[in-house]
Amino acid sequence: MDVLVSECSARLLQQEEEIKSLTAEIDRLKNCGCLGASPNLEQLQEENLKLKYRLNILRKSLQAERNKPTKNMINIISRLQEVFGHAIKAAYPDLENPPLLVTPSQQAKFGDYQCNSAMGISQMLKTKEQKVNPREIAENITKHLPDNECIEKVEIAGPGFINVHLRKDFVSEQLTSLLVNGVQLPALGENKKVIVDFSSPNIAKEMHVGHLRSTIIGESISRLFEFAGYDVLRLNHVGDWGTQFGMLIAHLQDKFPDYLTVSPPIGDLQVFYKESKKRFDTEEEFKKRAYQCVVLLQGKNPDITKAWKLICDVSRQELNKIYDALDVSLIERGESFYQDRMNDIVKEFEDRGFVQVDDGRKIVFVPGCSIPLTIVKSDGGYTYDTSDLAAIKQRLFEEKADMIIYVVDNGQSVHFQTIFAAAQMIGWYDPKVTRVFHAGFGVVLGEDKKKFKTRSGETVRLMDLLGEGLKRSMDKLKEKERDKVLTAEELNAAQTSVAYGCIKYADLSHNRLNDYIFSFDKMLDDRGNTAAYLLYAFTRIRSIARLANIDEEMLQKAARETKILLDHEKEWKLGRCILRFPEILQKILDDLFLHTLCDYIYELATAFTEFYDSCYCVEKDRQTGKILKVNMWRMLLCEAVAAVMAKGFDILGIKPVQRM
């Protein structure tokens, strides 16, 4: 729906429907008037006039709503889809759901956007035994285009492509609106709740590089949906339950017997875990005690529960160090949260007749899925299947989620598709109403294209990886002698921005479904599509106004008073690129592929460089360096680029700095 009227779309749709019915009623009355003398003729004519008057008022009201200024950025593809949708409906009123294909043009010679609906409509007409050339269809569509604020002209090319050229004044006005009102999307997700399940490490084990992707991708998806106006609940489904806690608690009792009264100095939890695992594997007596501890924990024994909480707290402190460093916020809701709901889940499936017993296990076969779910093990214990079913039900019925996104590696794809199918089978949700989605991702590889490991073959600890990033970032800044021009505070801010920004961007700039090679050398390279290059580009853009002695207040005043000219081809290219931001975000809201945003920011930075090299923003005396003239409309273009880049960085979880 046209974002210009997004806030009143429901009202407009209602008005449009009323217009259609009124038009039909007028036609009916006209026909009645031709039936010859009628005692009601005067009454009918009077009614006809009233209907025409109401119709005229509604049309004016509709146009006024469309022309009403909006503080939100316009999704130009959505606007053009609406315009062409009207034209296609008018040209081919009998076609049901005709294709509506509007895309950005790949080359400037083909205009700014293309409507490629004619070929699809030709195929639809062929099935109705109407043979019409796609080019004729394209001509018919263009004849029916309604008056609108955005199209300058259309051209028909090739077999029936409609090339669309935007009005310069329209683009200029939208850029001005962006500068005056800020980078804003319409409230697409108003009154809608999204749950994003991500990160989800195991308690008592350190986070490793495998958790990095889920954490970074999940946080970025959450930020995007928040920006689009959704109510987002970020959940950390930590592994805080199960057999491993039996051995950890038993080891805690032996190593710190006074743990109930004196807080145990566990120190390195990874070492503590390895010690307990070694004993579990080699000492039969210890193994028995560990199992007893699990039973006592499930029975909510107070001393055992305290030991469990102590271990969780120590682990949580370590996890929070990483979340704080990466600026990630999560609500912890681990497997333990769902323990009391498991019995009801099993009973519900049993009552509905979905449970079969196989070798002591209770299993559920789901139509279309090759592997059954095991909801009760042969020893009577529950499984990941049971807890994931309990979690999805709680999120649907108690949280009342409109959308649930699971950011978990590709290896869990079959598991989640089976969980989703089981939830649909039992009637918990309808996929046409509620979107439940597994946003899978590939593994992190080393430069040898094998799973990323330390030299000794161990999994890379995430804290060590972040520390290495900080070190290399500082080395790079000193290599560029930035330590000689930045204050200590600015240098530290730049170090953190580059280190964490590069790690996040290297991940997010790859298609999440693919494995990606982790290389500090590549991610810290300040050439090409890297965070280092983009962060430098951003600080350069921000410095243009500063070096011209133009402050924020002057820019805001200019935004309200200065028309943005787009006469130079590089100005025009940059202006259009800036305004593509909403359509890029809409695509990602649909498919959750964040590399599209990275590609866009890189494209924007490249378009800016072309513009800056061709168009003087500030004209100086070549001898003295004195500023002779400031081309304010170009300064405003710089500001618009910076505003969109800053919002893009924010969605990606990257913190730019003003000086680098």
From Swiss-Prot:
Keyword NADP: no
Localization per record: Cytoplasm; Cytoplasm, Cytosol
Motif ('HIGH' region): 201-212
GO molecular function: arginine binding; arginine-tRNA ligase activity; ATP binding; cadherin binding; tRNA binding
Modification type N-acetylmethionine: residues: M1
Chain sites annotated for binding L-arginine: S200, P201, N202, H211, Y384, D388, Q412
Region (Could be involved in the assembly of the multisynthetase complex): 1-72
Major subcellular location class: cytoplasm
Residue numbers spanned by region Interaction with tRNA: 529-543
Pfam families hit by this protein: Arg_tRNA_synt_N (PF03485), DALR_1 (PF05746), tRNA-synt_1d (PF00750)
EC top class named in words: ligase
EC numbers on record: 6.1.1.19
UniProt cross-references to PROSITE patterns, sorted A to Z: AA_TRNA_LIGASE_I
Keyword vocabulary terms for this entry: Acetylation, Aminoacyl-tRNA synthetase, ATP-binding, Cytoplasm, Disease variant, Leukodystrophy, Ligase, Nucleotide-binding, Protein biosynthesis
The keyword Disulfide bond appears for this protein: no
Clinical note on disease: Leukodystrophy, hypomyelinating, 9: An autosomal recessive neurodegenerative disorder characterized by delayed psychomotor development, severe spasticity, nystagmus, and ataxia associated with diffuse hypomyelination apparent on brain MRI.
Role description: Forms part of a macromolecular complex that catalyzes the attachment of specific amino acids to cognate tRNAs during protein synthesis. Modulates the secretion of AIMP1 and may be involved in generation of the inflammatory cytokine EMAP2 from AIMP1.
HAMAP family linked: Arg_tRNA_synth
Family recorded in the similarity comment: Belongs to the class-I aminoacyl-tRNA synthetase family.
Free-text comment on this protein's domains from its UniProt entry: The alpha-helical N-terminus (residues 1-72) mediates interaction with AIMP1 and thereby contributes to the assembly of the multisynthetase complex.
UniProt subunit comment: Interacts (via N-terminus) with AIMP1 (via N-terminus); this stimulates its catalytic activity. Interacts (via N-terminus) with LARS2 (via C-terminus). Monomer. Part of a multisubunit complex that groups tRNA ligases for Arg (RARS1), Asp (DARS1), Gln (QARS1), Ile (IARS1), Leu (LARS1), Lys (KARS1), Met (MARS1) the bifunctional ligase for Glu and Pro (EPRS1) and the auxiliary subunits AIMP1/p43, AIMP2/p38 and EEF1E1/p18. Interacts with QARS1. Part of a complex composed of RARS1, QARS1 and AIMP1.
Protein name from the UniProt record: Arginine--tRNA ligase, cytoplasmic
